[in-house]
Amino acid sequence: MKSLLLAATILLSTGAFAELAYDRPVTDRIDSGAIEYFIQGKGGATPKGNAACEDGLFYNNHFVALYDGATDKSGKSYDGKKGGRVAEEIIEKVFKSLPPEASKEDVLSRINQSYQDFYTAHPDMDFVKNATWRPTATLIWYSFARRELVAIGDSKARVDGVAINKKSKLVDDLNSELRVRVIKQLKLTEADVAKNDLGRFYILPLLERQSNFQNNPKAPKAFQYWAIDGFEIPAEEILVWRFDRTPKVIELSSDGYEDYPAASNVNAYEEDFAKFLKEDPQRIKNPSTKGLQEGNVSFDDRAVLIYKAR
């Protein structure tokens, strides 16, 4: 895989975000350093798979950001797009228009306003009462002007070799363990699960109910979680890390990658991913709410964005 990835690397010289190139490593530059990224939908390297990919990323001279649209559980679509893709596109559009020194409050305010515009365009749906219908995403970004890393939800980063915000949601942990228990109790093979994941089928009502805890300060504290969905997030739930100087290396990755590799480059991420996928395609050894479905190339979309200072 390493040689193929190296051979397929795209070199850009725009110094600013352009349309995403899927399925192959991309290198680029901004004023302060080098950019490398990779993104692929779980459906694989096809136009349809790329159009459905709910992970996204953005970079320019002022920000690096990565966002992960949540897998839809409602069955709803909007102009042919699932909620996770809608969330990805809303966030990307906002980052393209941000002023260089935008504060975290400004970023979130602009995102929420874009969401409200979207909700207004769909008056037949009550997004306040039915959180399951809300296009949802996690988001993490670094502001070069403010020298701060901001995370909403369980988005993760590694900064100068130190893992940040790797803690998972309790509701996800509980549902992941229950899914695996069902699979083991029914003695399902990996082939069985790939064709018909009865473990996920069993927990799907819980996944739908889980949205009642999303951005809901009235929910039991243990089950609360916070995400981008157009509704307010308490200031104390916005995670912020500040730095005296811009880090030498910033790695942002979605949960399509299980962990951080030894090296800080796309090839290392992809090599670790391939190994993990081979060893545990149905996410049983490392429990998750979903595994590798028949016809897909991964259990989830995946994206990684790496910045290296000059």
Predicted regions, residues:
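Classical Sec-dependent N-terminal signal peptides that target proteins to the secretory pathway
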Residues: 1-19
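PP2C/PPM-type serine/threonine phosphatase catalytic domain
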Residues: 19-310
